[in-house]
Amino acid sequence: MADIEDFRRLIAGDHGLVVVSTLRDNGTIASSVVNAGVLPHPLTGETVVGMVFRGGIRKLGHLRKRPYANVVIRAGWLWAAAEGRTDLAGPDDPMDGIDAERLRLLLREIFTAAGGTHDDFDTYDRVMREERRTAVFVHPERVYANPGQ
């Protein structure tokens, strides 16, 4: 049986690129490609899949109404999926215990957990603030992978 460490091992395979799927209002699936990493939840310490979404996108609306997502990562023919309930923390989605400074650092933590690097984190922070970026956490209630893993 797969676990979140199987998911984590694939992050370096393609810069943390994943396909994240949510449910639209009409029950159909909405999928897109984003970067994700595995890290401790900022409040509970639980190991979660973290992503950063630009403020105002439809996917955030989906997660506000139906807080559940599926995230699939792959490297070559190896893949793993994590699915579960979601939490949001951002300027439009306040989370108790996460103030503006903690959010700034949290967005960096997710970025680096996804394999990201940056030469100018002041600029990174400014862009994240201007775009009203939101941290998205998927609690891996179910993790599965291909048999070759």
Where are the regions a protein language model picked out?
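Short beta-strand segments
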Residues: 15-55, 63, 69-73, 81-85
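General secondary-structure edge motif
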Residues: 7, 42-44, 118
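Charged, gly/pro-rich active-site loop segments
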Residues: 2, 77-149
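A generic structural signal for nonpolar/aromatic side chains embedded in well-ordered alpha-helices
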Residues: 10-11, 63, 110, 138
